Regions:
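Strongly charged, low-complexity linkers/loops
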Residues: 362-373, 386-456
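Basic, nucleic-acid-interacting segments
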Residues: 1-295, 306, 312, 334-338, ...
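Extended, non-catalytic structural segments that build the interaction scaffolds
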Residues: 285-292, 299, 330-337, 372-384
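Structural motif
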Residues: 309, 333-343, 381-384, 441-445
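Short, amphipathic C-terminal "tail helix"
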Residues: 444-479
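Extended hydrophobic-aromatic, low-complexity segments
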Residues: 279-280, 315, 327-330, 339-342, ...
Length: 479
């Protein structure tokens, strides 16, 4: 609706990829029986003391570095006090006064160009337990309680559901690239609280904020934003007043519904966590962690275009998943200069088809970059033809091995002997007189049919280019 500005901010909670919980040694294995991965610390027993997970600190700092944040070399934990069944000790250990990471941002690509979405801060905390509701009762599963959770708080700089999606997808890609989280939405690894407000154009102050809690699917976030923006615009355009409140998304109804009103910011009565010492990081430690960072996906796309001569679309598809880009680059380097597009074609057609059919990732299949590079070399050297290579690829994908060994063992080498090929061509012409007559009548497609017959006679081993040339020459003699 013209005349109004939309403002969106996101608070994204990301479960970090650690083996154990934030303040105890309990396992984080997903899918285990309820309330089995627990101990006195994560259950909040009196007198149980937390011990900080160093790996969680490292992964949070690495995330901040990937996102261009300033790292707070002295960081502290605080107690966020609230009473709710999902936090048995009645407070959450979080960071409020001195979070680990400050500033930074995510660059998104929109149809109108690039836009930088600024981040306010990233803090580290423990996750709450999971409340499971049934028809007659609710239960609390404390397996999740204490999971290392990184909260990435954006500035209110998003102005549409499309921008919110671009931000979340870019953020997810960067974090997965860095190896700090799986960002598996189905397992709850990535969840967002969404803040939306509307205000008249020209008004500096933001409108009244409405928060939608704990959204765990991109599709749901997009739909909730669309609905809530329309609801708020409809209200203010008819003289209504937006109430500051927390709402939930009801996917089955396709609408947001009130949970609780918030006349003022909720008072969590933060105070410094007395059982944990501050995190003190040296410059050397921060730089050591910086050295572990991968290349940003956006930078990798640009570099691969320049280094391997592949188009922007190919680079975007390949760089979308780090393991795919790693595989492509390894194979392209083995193939040598000028073969980037060839390797890209193989990966984006045949290999991605096999990945889709099997539901595997490239790291889960048996195909290696060395095998793909050798397959490309065999085709380029005319030791085998394209159809034979495509027949070999599924076996290499499923069972591994090297294509040269398979070609030798099965006698699949390409037939390029002129005399042998000429005999095949003569046989095809002799057995298909109608095609010869069609060619004489000007139907050039008849030559292609005869080439196919030669390939069939040679069991796919004939060199296609030589066959095409021979067929054309033999037909010309008969015109």
């Amino acid at each position: 609706m013209s005349g109004y500005l939309i403002t969106i901010g996101l608070e994204t909670h990301v479960q970090l990829k650690t083996r154990t919980k934030m303040f105890c040694g309990c396992s984080l294995a997903f899918g285990t029986e309820s309330n089995t991965n627990v101990c006195p610390v994560c259950l909040g027993y009196p007198g149980a003391l937390p011990v900080m997970n160093r790996e969680a600190v490292k992964l949070t700092v690495m995330s901040g570095l990937m996102l261009g944040c300033e790292i707070n070399r002295v960081s502290t934990f605080d107690r966020k006090n609230y009473f709710y069944p999902d936090m048995s000790k009645d407070y959450q250990i979080s960071q409020q006064a001195k979070p680990l990471c400050l500033g930074g941002g995510v660059t998104i690509q929109m149809p109108e160009g690039q836009k930088r979405i600024r981040i306010n801060h990233i803090h580290l905390e423990e996750d709450a337990a999971k409340i499971n509701h049934s028809a007659r009762f609710s239960g609390v599963d404390f397996n999740r309680c204490g999971t290392p959770l990184m909260e990435i708080v954006s500035e209110p700089g998003l102005s549409s559901p499309e921008e919110a999606m671009a931000y979340l997808q870019s953020l997810k890609q960067i974090l997965v690239y860095a190896g700090v989280s799986d960002c598996n939405l189905e397992e709850g690894n990535m969840r967002s609280d969404v803040n939306i407000s509307v205000r008249p154009e020209g008004q500096e102050a933001l409108g009244t904020k409405v928060e939608i809690k704990n959204m765990n699917t991109f599709k749901g976030i997009y739909a909730a934003l669309e609905y809530e923006i329309a609801r708020q615009l409809g209200a203010v355009s008819h003289g209504g007043v937006i109430v500051q409140e927390t709402r939930r998304w009801e996917a089955e109804l396709g609408e947001t519904q009130p949970m609780r009103t918030k006349e003022n910011a909720h008072d969590y009565r933060y105070f410094p966590e007395p059982d944990l010492v501050p995190i003190v990081l040296s410059a050397e430690q921060v730089e050591a962690w910086r050295a572990l960072l991968p290349e940003l996906p956006s930078m990798r796309r640009v570099r691969m275009m320049a280094e391997y001569g592949i188009p922007e679309y190919d680079a975007g598809v390949l760089a979308d998943a780090k393991e795919n880009a790693d595989f492509f680059e390894a194979a392209a380097r083995l193939c040598g200069q000028g073969q980037g597009k060839t390797v890209s074609n193989w990966f984006m057609t045949e290999i991605m088809r096999l990945l889709s059919e099997t539901g595997k990732t490239i790291t889960q299949c048996a195909l290696t970059p060395e095998a793909l590079a050798e397959l490309v070399a065999l085709v380029n050297g005319r030791a085998i033809n394209g159809p034979t290579a495509k027949e070999l690829l599924p076996e290499l994908f499923n069972n591994g091995g090297m294509p040269g060994v398979l070609v030798h063992a099965r006698g699949l080498g390409q037939v390029s002997d002129a005399g042998t090929l000429e005999a095949f061509v003569e046989q095809a012409i002799r057995e298909n007189p109608k095609s010869v007559e069609d060619y004489k009548a000007g139907k050039k497609a008849a030559a292609g049919f005869l080439v196919g017959q030669v390939m069939k006679l040679s069991h796919g081993k004939a060199a296609p280019q030589q066959v095409g040339k021979l067929v054309t020459e033999k037909l010309a003699e008969r015109v």
